[in-house]
């Protein structure tokens, strides 16, 4: 594993996001987009014809190349390493395949009976290829923008690992929460341990921010407040505390973002978990978010479908969103990942609309 403390990376030129998180005023509102290196880009689609999804994730040179695609094409204020939240289940011994038009499929889902078979020893070490991709990308960015690392949150990963992929109900994984609580906590602890080690690996490799996704397929949305408090909150808090403690030991400053899609019921509690930024989906108004979170730094929350609007419409929706949040303590993003059929032109307009806001 590359150790950041022994690296000499180029100085950062665009620190808008980091300034906002520190409470300083940037020259322009910062913006990046979840899945910004993705199928909406023709260049990415051509690249995918040559390489499978996990081949890209597991090959540092390829992951670096894809990560840089949107940075070279657009005026984004951050890059996010090209990877997937399911690399952790892979490291634990699950067989994960990305099927076209289906999404991820896990051939050997976790059950109560095979829980002991997870290969927990050295799991994070088996993800060194992500660290290598981060180091390579950080160098090739040459300080243009900061680089974000990420991981899936424990409940999100648990859902995939038990269901064997995405689900309309998550009934198999929720069954554990009601009928097999001891085993559920055991699996969540296993995942939390690996996530912490994995995030530190990313920091040591050069990640300048970290995002935790409790969001894929609306996983937090499938829980009520009671379940979120018991099966998400303690583990999310432990991740924030332990990762931040280890970052401090490294004498580094790496902010952490929590994005728990569909968890409006827990926004006030999320503020106390120790994350620097709270990600917001598009199904709650910015004004309501500010009433709940006050001056907490937030990230979001344009409806991805707003990018289907006319250029004038996109600008109007951006203005309305920013009016609700205010220009302070805000990192602009979509309320979830960008969709494959969206246009690069719409993304350009989105970015320009954000950067044109007078602070």
PLM feature spans:
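N-terminal basic, low-complexity leaders that serve as flexible interaction/assembly modules and, when applicable
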Residues: 2-100, 136, 315, 344-359
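Generic detection of long, well-ordered alpha-helical segments
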Residues: 11, 60-61, 124-127, 185
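A short acidic, glycine/proline-enriched capping/turn motif at secondary-structure boundaries
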Residues: 85-88, 103-104, 112-113, 154-156
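A gly/proline- and charged-residue-enriched helix-loop-helix capping module
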Residues: 101-139
């Amino acid at each position: 594993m590359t150790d950041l403390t022994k690296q000499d990376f180029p100085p950062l030129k665009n620190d808008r996001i980091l300034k906002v998180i520190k409470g300083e005023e940037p020259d322009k509102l910062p913006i990046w987009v979840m899945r910004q290196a993705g199928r909406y880009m023709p260049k990415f689609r051509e690249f995918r014809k040559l390489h499978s999804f996990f081949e890209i994730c597991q090959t540092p040179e390829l992951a670096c190349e894809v990560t840089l695609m949107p940075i070279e094409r657009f005026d984004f204020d951050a890059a996010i390493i090209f990877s997937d939240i399911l690399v952790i289940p892979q490291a634990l011994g699950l067989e994960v395949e990305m099927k076209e038009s289906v999404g991820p499929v896990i051939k050997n889902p976790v059950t109560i009976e095979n829980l002991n078979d997870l290969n927990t020893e050295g799991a994070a070490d088996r993800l060194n290829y992500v660290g290598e991709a981060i180091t390579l990308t950080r160098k090739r960015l040459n300080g243009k923008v900061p680089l974000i690392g990420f991981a899936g949150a424990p409940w999100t990963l648990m859902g995939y690992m038990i269901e064997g992929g995405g689900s309309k109900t998550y009934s198999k994984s929720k069954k554990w929460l009601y009928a097999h609580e001891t085993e559920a906590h055991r699996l969540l602890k296993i995942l939390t341990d690996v996530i912490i080690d994995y995030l530190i690996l990313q920091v040591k490799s050069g990640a300048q921010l970290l995002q935790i996704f409790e969001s894929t397929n609306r996983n937090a949305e499938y829980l009520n407040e009671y379940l979120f408090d018991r099966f998400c909150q303690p583990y999310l808090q432990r991740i924030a505390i332990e990762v931040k403690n280890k970052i401090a030991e490294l004498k580094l400053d790496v902010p952490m973002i929590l994005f728990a899609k569909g968890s409006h019921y827990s926004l006030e509690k999320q503020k106390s978990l120790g994350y620097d930024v709270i990600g917001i989906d598009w199904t709650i108004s910015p004004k309501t978010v500010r009433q709940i979170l006050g001056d907490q730094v937030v990230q979001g929350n344009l409806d991805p479908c707003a990018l289907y609007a006319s250029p004038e419409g996109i600008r109007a929706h951006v203005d309305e969103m920013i009016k609700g949040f205010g220009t302070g303590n805000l990192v602009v993003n979509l309320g979830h990942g960008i969709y494959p059929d969206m246009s690069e032109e719409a993304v350009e307009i989105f970015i320009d609309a954000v950067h044109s806001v007078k602070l």
